[in-house]
């Protein structure tokens, strides 16, 4: 019999097939992006609210079906499926209430009839989600949230690291599009999240990609050249070639080719450029770009996008410290999890602010959400332990969106990354806001890397990547005059207009569509023909 572990991440899904008798991982399948339109969790939530939770649920479930097909097994032999993710992803997966996550105000929730929403642990038949004929002998395990806004993924990053047992002030961050984080001071825990955006994982930048084979994940200096480091088919780091980042001259290739760059590669490139004097102030680059391989470049626009992500994380870290009442120098441990937390050079991350440069010890982990799901697959009784621990964690949640401290920090970060504001001016601005100056970066810290890759074991069947999920959303456009302005305006080539049975239809690739943060197609239409609230799923 088999078990399946599933991580519903904001930037993509990860799943593993496990032999329940031998406890061996047999195969790993990942997607190269989230199936819902948008680049962050709030985009996904907005899509579900606007278009309908049933549609969002259907897109997610169809994506999971397509991932499970990659296992090439008789799915009736799957006995257990454990699913982990943030509250929004897990609610959409289960097709349960999400409006409490969309509307923070109690009056608004009461007006909508939203009351006493609980996100407790659940064990239920897979037929409730997938129907009677699919996973017919399987039960689904969903771990609990700590609070409605502190989900199973946040619980996982606390459980799968040493975070909860540390007596000294400690910070844990799951580096991803939504950047979940928690600060522990004695028995007190403060949680938060920073909507860093997709650039932190390599999306939304010109040559960017999620961590996968061929992705540049790191760079190292060798004289005037940079050694490009890529991920191989087993997701291990491998030296590729030397390149002059200004001229693009390549030499000394080891045979590994790069096809794009991850967010961790971008962080390393920025750190190298600063050390080597190629960057004096952001976002300016020599000749307007850094060349990392044939067709692989970092532009000044990419610097701005990545800087917004790094800046959001640094601002959130500093906000947690300031609001908690401790000093920067009190922070003992910083735990880094997720793909970006695993692959990034922690020293580079410290120098740029993606990791707290004032923490005395940094420990790097991998995908803690998938790790917890795997534990629940292998040992169902582990859920009882998780529930008990979740009950004991009394966490306060700090909303960055309404925090004046965060807003002030982030304004300074934006000025630093997008306008080249000097650090001296940054400190002057902080003084005006009544905030402490930027923390000093410690020169001698302990960095411990406990994993070599995001997912330690991909299994004997290897890693399968679902690059194109292939889910299409359609809506009739009766007033369409076939000018195709919407198609030309779409920055991701996610849209096409077709005629079928005498009717014009707008077809969206759900994975490519930028969702709420874009909607250029709606704005540019001269006939106001596109009603995104009526989108429905169809096959590609």
Swiss-Prot record:
GO MF annotation list: 4 iron, 4 sulfur cluster binding; metal ion binding; oxidoreductase activity
UniProt keyword annotations, A-Z: 4Fe-4S, Iron, Iron-sulfur, Metal-binding, Methanogenesis, Oxidoreductase
Listed InterPro entries: 4Fe4S_Fe-S-bd, 4Fe4S_Fe_S_CS, Corrinoid_activation_enz, Raco-like_middle, Raco-like_middle_sf, RACo_C, RamA_corrin_act
Entries under SUPFAM superfamilies matching the protein: 4Fe-4S ferredoxins (SSF54862)
Pfam family, one: Fer4_21
Domain of life: Archaea
PROSITE patterns: 4FE4S_FER_1, 4FE4S_FER_2
This enzyme's EC code(s): 1.16.99.1
GO biological process: methanogenesis
Cofactor note: Binds 2 [4Fe-4S] clusters.
Catalytically driven reaction(s): 2 Co(II)-[methylamine-specific corrinoid protein] + AH2 + ATP + H2O = 2 Co(I)-[methylamine-specific corrinoid protein] + A + ADP + phosphate + 3 H(+); 2 Co(II)-[dimethylamine-specific corrinoid protein] + AH2 + ATP + H2O = 2 Co(I)-[dimethylamine-specific corrinoid protein] + A + ADP + phosphate + 3 H(+); 2 Co(II)-[trimethylamine-specific corrinoid protein] + AH2 + ATP + H2O = 2 Co(I)-[trimethylamine-specific corrinoid protein] + A + ADP + phosphate + 3 H(+)
Binding site for [4Fe-4S] cluster 2: 490, 513, 518, 521
Keyword NAD: no
Pathway: One-carbon metabolism; methanogenesis from methylamine; One-carbon metabolism; methanogenesis from dimethylamine; One-carbon metabolism; methanogenesis from trimethylamine
Domain 4Fe-4S ferredoxin-type residue range list: 471-500, 504-535
Cofactor dependence: [4Fe-4S] cluster
Subunit architecture: Monomer.
Function in brief: Reductase required for the activation of corrinoid-dependent methylamine methyltransferase reactions during methanogenesis. Mediates the ATP-dependent reduction of corrinoid proteins from the inactive cobalt(II) state to the active cobalt(I) state. Acts on the corrinoid proteins involved in methanogenesis from monomethylamine (MMA), dimethylamine (DMA) and trimethylamine (TMA), namely MtmC, MtbC and MttC, respectively.
NCBIfam families: Rama_corrin_act (TIGR04270)
Protein name as annotated: [Co(II) methylated amine-specific corrinoid protein] reductase
């Amino acid at each position: 019999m088999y078990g399946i572990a599933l991580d519903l991440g904001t930037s993509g899904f990860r799943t593993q097939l496990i032999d329940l008798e031998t406890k061996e991982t047999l195969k790993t399948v990942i997607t190269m992006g989230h199936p819902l339109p948008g680049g962050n969790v709030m985009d996904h939530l907005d899509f579900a609210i606007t278009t309908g939770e049933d549609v969002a649920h259907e897109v997610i479930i169809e994506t999971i079906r397509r991932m499970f097909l990659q296992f090439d097994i008789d799915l009736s032999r799957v006995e257990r499926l454990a699913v982990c993710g943030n509250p929004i992803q897990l609610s959409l997966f289960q097709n349960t209430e999400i409006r409490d996550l969309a509307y923070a105000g109690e009056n608004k929730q009461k007006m909508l009839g939203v009351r006493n929403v609980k996100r407790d642990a659940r064990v239920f038949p897979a037929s409730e989600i997938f129907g009677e004929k699919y996973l017919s002998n399987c039960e689904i395990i969903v771990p609990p949230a700590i609070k409605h806004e502190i989900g199973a993924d946040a619980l996982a990053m606390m459980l799968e690291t040493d975070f909860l047992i540390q007596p000294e002030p400690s910070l844990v961050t799951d580096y991803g599009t939504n950047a979940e984080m928690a600060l522990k001071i004695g028995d007190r825990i403060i949680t938060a999240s920073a909507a860093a955006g997709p650039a932190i994982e390599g999306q939304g930048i010109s040559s960017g990609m999620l961590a996968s084979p061929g992705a540049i994940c790191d760079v190292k200096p060798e004289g005037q050249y940079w050694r490009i480091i890529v991920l191989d088919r087993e997701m291990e780091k491998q030296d590729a070639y030397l390149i002059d980042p200004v001229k693009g001259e390549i030499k000394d290739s080891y045979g590994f080719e790069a096809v794009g760059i991850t967010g961790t590669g971008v962080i390393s490139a920025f750190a190298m450029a600063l050390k080597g004097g190629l960057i004096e102030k952001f976002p300016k680059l020599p000749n307007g770009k850094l060349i990392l391989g044939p067709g692989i470049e970092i532009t000044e626009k990419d610097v701005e996008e990545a800087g917004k992500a790094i800046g959001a994380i640094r601002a959130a870290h500093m906000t947690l410290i300031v609001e908690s009442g401790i000093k920067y120098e009190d922070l003992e441990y910083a735990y880094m999890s997720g793909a970006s937390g695993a692959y990034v050079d922690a020293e580079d991350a410290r120098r740029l602010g993606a990791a707290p440069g004032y923490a005395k010890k940094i420990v790097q982990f991998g995908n803690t959400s998938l790790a917890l799901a795997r534990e629940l697959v292998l040992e169902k009784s582990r859920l009882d332990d998780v529930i008990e621990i979740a009950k004991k964690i009394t966490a306060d949640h700090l909303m960055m969106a309404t925090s004046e401290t965060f807003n002030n920090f982030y304004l300074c970060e934006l000025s630093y990354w997008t306008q080249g504001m000097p650090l001296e001016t940054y400190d002057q601005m902080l003084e005006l806001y009544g905030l402490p100056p930027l923390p000093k970066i410690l020169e001698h810290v302990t960095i411990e890397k406990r994993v070599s890759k995001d997912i330690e074991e991909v299994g004997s069947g290897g890693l399968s990547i679902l690059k194109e999920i292939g889910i299409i959303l359609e809506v009739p456009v009766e007033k369409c005059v076939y000018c195709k302005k919407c198609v030309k305006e779409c920055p991701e080539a996610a849209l096409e207009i077709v005629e079928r049975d005498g009717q014009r239809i707008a077809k969206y690739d759900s994975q490519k569509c930028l969702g709420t943060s874009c909607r250029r197609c709606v704005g540019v239409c001269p006939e106001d023909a596109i009603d995104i609230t009526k989108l429905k799923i169809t096959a590609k």
